[in-house]
Amino acid sequence: METRDVLIVGGGVIGCATAYELSQYKLKVTLVEKHHYLAQETSHANSGVIHTGIDPNPHKLTAKYNILGKKLWLNTYFKRLGFPRQKIRTLIVAFNEMEREQLEVLKQRGIANQINLEDIQMLSKEETLKLEPYVNPEIVAGLKIEGSWAIDPVLASKCLALAAQQNKVQICTNTEVTNISKQVDGTYLVWTNNETTPSFKVKKIIDAAGHYADYLAHLAKADDFEQTTRRGQYVVVTNQGELHLNSMVFMVPTIHGKGVIVSPMLDGNFLVGPTALDGVDKEATRYITKDAPCMLTKIGKHMVPSLNINNALISFAGSRPIDKATNDFIIRVAHNDPDFVILGGMKSPGLTAAPAIVREAVRLLNWKLTKKPNWNGKYNLPWI
């Protein structure tokens, strides 16, 4: 059996970006994904935003990697890779004096997280409504932040994977890891449920398994960290020309997330959500509750009264993995095994942070790596 250098487990945006980064080195790399398609869990059902860094607490890894990740998207990934995206400002609206005070807290947090002063501005009620006339006139203030982007996270993941594949990374879908055993020679034997690729022998494992990152680490006897879930449900409202927004409009964030958003989508429709429900069973993170679409359209209409709730098109749900101990990213080697790299707790802003997270994952392999002389990091999906 051939020995692969690195096995990446998980084909979301984190796993695909890891494959892309590793594809530039002289390594034998395999990515396995249990679903038929890539990016079908957390990467499939989220707001699709490259965030400015307004929300994470500055002392957290989420803040550090948000800052670094956004720079890499803009300065490197966007220049090399072609997939749907659009620059769009963020507007957070306050409906009372307490929320207005929170906007000032967010502004100072954003400045601490390296948002340029000219890109972040407190707005009066009148300035907010001049900027976005369709926002509820009952608001008392707004916070405008320039520099965010809307992207399609599924197509971004696919683009990263195809770019990696053109540089000889092996991508195996329909391949779920069922067992892992560390051998006396220091390699791993990894078994899967795929008859075509039933097992792999590998030197290092990068755990990018999303909600199942803790399960995979336990399976390998590498670490005992634990995750919980935070399910978010969304509704898509069709745009029939009665409403125009130039910003992603957020409510003031809570401890559960960045707040409900009403945002133009890349296809011209509007995204409303998410909800936030903790502790949902891992197998139920994609389930829609009966009351969620009605609740979301009600909140969305409160934020933007012209939103036509009768135009609700579809609802969907996804979940963010939350590290129980830190409520932060986990980016480190496993406590019991230096050859097992954990990328866990990939909640928001995991999409924004992805390019920086995976560069750290490459560093954690602790190898002196040689770049391929003919590496081609450019790839364009056919999109309009």
UniProtKB/Swiss-Prot annotation:
Signal peptide: 1-15
Lipid moiety-binding region (S-diacylglycerol cysteine): 16
Domain of life: Bacteria
GO cellular component, one term: plasma membrane
Cofactor dependence: FAD
Catalytic residues, chain numbering: 51 (proton acceptor)
Enzymatic class: oxidoreductase
Enzyme Commission code: 1.1.3.21
Annotated catalysed reactions: sn-glycerol 3-phosphate + O2 = dihydroxyacetone phosphate + H2O2
Residues binding sn-glycerol 3-phosphate: 47, 51, 258, 320, 348
Pathway: Polyol metabolism; glycerol degradation via glycerol kinase pathway; glycerone phosphate from sn-glycerol 3-phosphate (aerobic route): step 1/1
Pfam families linked: DAO
Keyword Lipoprotein attached: yes
InterPro entries (UniProt xref): FAD-dep_OxRdtase, FAD/NAD-bd_sf, G3P_Oxidase/Oxidoreductase
Lipid-attached positions, N-palmitoyl cysteine: 16
Alphabetically ordered keywords of this record: Cell membrane, Cytoplasm, FAD, Flavoprotein, Glycerol metabolism, Lipoprotein, Membrane, Oxidoreductase, Palmitate, Signal, Virulence
Disruption-associated phenotype: Cells lacking this gene do not grow at all in glycerol-containing medium, and exhibit a significantly reduced formation of hydrogen peroxide and a severely reduced cytotoxicity.
Compartments, as annotated in UniProt: Cytoplasm; Cell membrane
Any one GO BP annotation for this protein: glycerol catabolic process
Subunit structure: Monomer.
Function description: Catalyzes the oxidation of glycerol 3-phosphate to dihydroxyacetone phosphate (DHAP), with a reduction of O2 to H2O2. The formation of hydrogen peroxide by this enzyme is crucial for cytotoxic effects of M.pneumoniae on host cells. Is involved in the metabolism of glycerol and is essential for glycerol utilization; glycerol is one of the few carbon sources that can be utilized by M.pneumoniae for growth. To a lesser extent, is also able to use glyceraldehyde 3-phosphate (GAP), an intermediate in the glycolysis pathway, as a substrate (but the structure of the product has not been elucidated).
Protein name: Glycerol 3-phosphate oxidase
Underlying gene: glpD
